[in-house]
Amino acid sequence: MKKSLYSLFAVLAIFCACQDENSQLGKSLVESSFYNVYADTCSVDISTILLDSIETRGDSICQLGHYRSSAWGEVSATYYAEYSTSDFTPNTDYTYTLDSLVLRMIPSGHFWGDTLTQQRISIYRLKKPIVLDNDEDLYNSTVLPTEDAPLFSFTFTPCPGRKKEVSVRLPDSWGQQLLNDLVAQDDYFDTQDKFKKKFPGLVFVPENDGQCITGFMVNDSAMSINLHYQEVSNQRTGQVLTFNVNTDYAYTGIRHDPTGTHLASLKSGIENLVHSSDMGCLAYMQGLTGYYNQLEFPYLNSLGSAGQIVSIESATLYLYPLARSYNEVSQLPNDIRLYITDENNVLEDYVYGSDGVTVQTGDLTIDEMYGKETYYSFDLTEFIRNNYGTSGIKRQKLLMSLTDEESTTTFNQVIFTNDPEQENQCKLDIRFKIYNEQ
C-alpha cells in the first residue's frame, strides 16, 4: 500500500511585491486593480528514489573499476562479455606464427574517482555461456558464475581526458592455442553457438582497493581481442584477426554498498522514496546505481492568499548541486530530464520548452570561479499553471533523472542541496499577477 510521505519542512512563500500603478479598466461600476508580484522562495519537496535494477545489456559503453566515496559508499563495476566468432581460412601454402594476442580498450571519457591512481583488473572465464529466455535480460544487478582462478590480471592508469588507448597483451599460450585451432580448422569457429560453448566469454573484475572507475567504448574494435600473427611463405606478412564483443550478450554489473551514508536505509521502489529533509537536506541522482528524484510543490496553492484571482506569468525551477561534490573526482551530467506523472506515478509526458516541442534538459550553468552559483534550471511555467489550484488526484508530480543513455552507461551524478538555512537551495521562482475587486 502506498504511503503519503509529504514533508512539511517548508515555510509559506515570501512575497516581494513589485507592484505596477493601479490601472482602471473602463468605467465599470466595479473598480478593479492588477498587480505584478514576484515570489522568490516557493518551496520544493525533492526526494530520492532507488530503482531495483537497470538494464545494461547491449550498451556502447562499459564501466570498469572500484571506488569508495564518503557520499555514495563503495561501488564496483564489472564487465561481462561474450565474444563473436571470426572467419579464418588457412592457406596450405603458408605456415603461421603467433605475434601476440591483445585486448584493445578505448576510454569513453567517463570516470569516477582518482584518475592518477592505477587500476588492477583480473580477467576471468565465464563458467557457462550466457543464455536468455524470451522474458529475460541482463541488468546492473545480474551476477554470473566465473571460473575460480583468473586467466590473467593487468594494471593500467586511467587517462579518460585524453582517451588514450589501453592495449593489454594477453598470455601467449592462449593466443597460440587460438591460432593452432584456427589453422586446424576446428569446427567450433563455424557458428556462434559452437563458439560460445567452447569459449563462453570473459568477465573483467576490478580489485577492491582501486580508487577509480573508468568508462570504455564497446564496438567492433573497442574491448576487442586481436590475434596478431604472421603468414609465412617466401616472405612474412603481418595479419590481424579480431574477435569483437557480441553486445547482445554483454553488460555492466554493479555492486553497491552504501553503508555509512545517507543512502544506507533507502530501499528500492518509488513507494520507498525518502525526502531530502530526512537525508541531511540532500537528494541524490546517479547513473548505473539507479538513483533518481521526485519533485513536488506542496505550498503552491498558498499563492491564492495574495489576491482574489492569481494569474501565473512565469515559473522557473532552480536546482543547486552541493558545493565541492563534483569536478575533482566526479562529473556533473550536462543533461537531466523532467517527466510529468499523475498521482499514481504513471508517466504522462516530458517537460517541454516554451515551443512545446523541445524537451528541456536542465540548462546547466557552471560557476567556474567559486562554484557557488552552479545550478540547473527548468522553465515550469506551463506545469505550474496546470497544477495551481489543484490537489489530491488532480495534482501532478515530477520525476527527474539522467537521460536514458547516461543512466545505463555512466556514473554521472548530482547531489542536490535543499537546506532551508542556506541561500542556494532548490527553489521555484514564480512571477504572477493578482486581481482584486475594489
Regions found by a protein language model. Give the residues of each.
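Secreted, disulfide-rich extracellular signaling modules
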Residues: 2-6, 12, 18-438
